[in-house]
A protein has these predicted regions:
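Signature of Gram-negative outer-membrane beta-barrel scaffolds
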Residues: 1-99, 124
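Surface-exposed loop/turn segments flanking beta-strands in extracellular/periplasmic regions
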Residues: 2-27, 76, 124-133, 172-185, ...
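Hydrophobic, lipid-facing positions within transmembrane beta-strands of outer-membrane proteins
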Residues: 37-43, 60, 88-92, 104, ...
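Residue-level detector of the transmembrane beta-barrel scaffold of outer-membrane proteins
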Residues: 42-44, 53-57, 91, 103-105, ...
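Gram-negative outer-membrane beta-barrel transporters
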Residues: 48-51, 162-164, 184-292
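Transmembrane beta-strands of outer-membrane beta-barrel pores
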Residues: 49-51, 60-64, 108-114, 123, ...
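Surface-exposed extracellular loop regions of Gram-negative outer-membrane beta-barrel proteins
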Residues: 62-71, 82, 96-143, 155, ...
Length: 292
């Protein structure tokens, strides 16, 4: 960040700016453009023979990022370095129909995708052209096996899955001593998801449908992770966490934390879910449903 200092930002200087009346065209906090360009190719092969059908697919892509910042940089340094990431996917699967009622299936996949623009390619994309010195593609490995049953009145699907998320970029937030919120960009985060899923549809007669599902999951974080701390304006914070701006991104005085999350359950969504529904159609044009 040559020709710009963090303390030149209004948010880091005299706080009286907060009470200044803005005019049309005034800029606060940030004024930048984020540019993303992508190119890719995809191919898929499908094969069917009697009761067996299978497929394999793959893709390769390039994702490029750069930003142009009119707020924190002069014109000579407004455009950041262009960064590019190669990603790819490999997927395959097969289904075998044992007979008219029973089938089994399996799927495998591996994905390597470009890191996100913010927190991945750039350390703090809202305020700085500083790129991540060690960006990593996010990877996903997933495997699934399952069984299906079909009859005149009952359809059932049962499957088990195992998924590994590797080198994820995750954002966390907390409060600081001055009452502002701290934003932490975590990278290199791993997680493991596995579980069983069951769903069914029962139609014992033409006027009654019964549907249900059950999902049992075990999702947990598989690694600890390190992240640097910023305020809500995107400014790097010192270890005092009182709103004082650090001398630079990833500088010696830039606060960071090591999040001890290995073995902790992944939050944000239920890992055990169930549902049951009944639909009654006593006459043409009338339907009554109840769901739990």
């Amino acid at each position: 960040r040559k020709n710009v200092k963090a303390e030149q930002n209004a948010a880091a200087a005299d706080p009286n700016w907060k009470y200044q009346k803005l005019q049309v065209g005034d800029k606060v906090y940030r004024d930048y453009d984020g540019h993303v360009h992508q190119e890719g190719v995809f191919a898929q092969l499908e094969w069917t023979k009697k009761n067996l059908n299978a497929f394999v697919s793959g893709s390769v892509s390039n994702t490029g990022y750069w930003r142009y910042d009119r707020f924190y940089y002069d014109a000579a340094h407004a455009e950041s370095e262009h960064v590019n990431f190669i990603g790819y996917t490999v997927k395959g699967g097969a289904n075998y129909n044992i007979n008219e009622k029973h089938n089994v299936f399996a799927n495998l996949g591996y994905i390597s995708r470009a890191p996100f623009f913010s927190g991945g390619a750039f350390l703090q994309s809202t305020t700085s052209n500083a790129k991540n010195p060690d960006p990593l593609n996010e990877k996903v490995f997933s495997a699934e096996v399952g069984y299906g049953f079909r009859s005149g009145i009952l359809s059932v699907n049962l499957n088990g899955y195992y998924t590994l998320w590797m080198d994820k970029s995750v954002v966390r937030s907390s409060s600081m001593a001055n009452g502002d919120y701290a934003r932490v960009n975590l990278s290199g985060v791993d997680a493991r998801h596995m579980g069983l899923e069951l769903d069914f549809v029962l139609r014992p007669n033409r006027w009654l449908d019964v549907t249900g599902m059950l999902s049992l999951g075990d999702w947990q974080w598989d690694s600890d992770s390190k992240g640097y701390i910023y305020d809500t304006q995107g400014q790097p914070q010192t270890k005092a966490l009182d709103g004082t701006v650090a001398s630079g991104i990833m500088a010696e005085d830039h606060a960071w934390l090591n999040l001890k999350q290995k073995g902790i359950k992944v939050g944000g969504s239920a890992q055990t879910t169930g549902a049951l529904g009944i639909t009654v159609s006593p006459m043409k044009g009338l339907r009554v449903s109840a769901d739990w």
